Amino acid sequence: MHYPEPITKLMDSFMKLPGIGPKSAARLAFYVLDMKEDDVLDFAKALVDAKRNLSFCSVCGHITDKDPCYICSDTSRDRSVICVVQESKDVIAMEKMRDFHGLYHVLHGTISPMDGIGPEDINIPDLLKRLQDDTIEEVILATNPNVEGEATAMYISRLLRPSGIKVTRIAHGLPVGGDLEYADEVTLSKAMEGRREV
């Protein structure tokens, strides 16, 4: 079907988002056209503001509008434990369960040789710098239970073995091949309780 160029451009923009195909993009584009102009301008401003005002925490790599982020700035958190996750959305999922009171480290990906992504391409070097702090007693590896997540967890555990820091892996109450962001709070809580040393 042929659409006017502004609709086609809008649809193309929506299709750049994950999980949005042509039908969903058309539905969203026509929804936007039906919105009040003020609402469309607010929506556009929110997108631009988020892109301009958010960055990554210089300590843990979590997305934030302040540096360091609210988690790293919270003096009540247990600074002897660092939970390593793949993405910022995993931090948000872990925080929803309200059981973990330590700190986080966001890798921004996983090791994936098939995609040409090695350890130096994700946030592992910064993790190693953080672990030079003598107060760190445990690193919890909470990468996703898929091939890349397991490979990344195994790589980090082998890297840390000589350090004497306790390295644990969250239990697999999570489905193999699943993502942390889609797990409910109870499943995540049980996975944290059942973590094991690696």
From Swiss-Prot:
Keywords: DNA damage, DNA recombination, DNA repair, Metal-binding, Zinc, Zinc-finger. CDD domains: TOPRIM_recR. GO terms for biological process: DNA recombination; DNA repair. It comes from the Bacteria. May play a role in DNA repair. It seems to be involved in an RecBC-independent recombinational process of DNA repair. It may act with RecF and RecO. A zinc finger (C4-type) spans 57-72. GO terms for molecular function: DNA binding; zinc ion binding. Residues 80-175 form the Toprim domain. Belongs to the RecR family. The keyword Methyltransferase does not apply. The gene is recR. This is Recombination protein RecR.
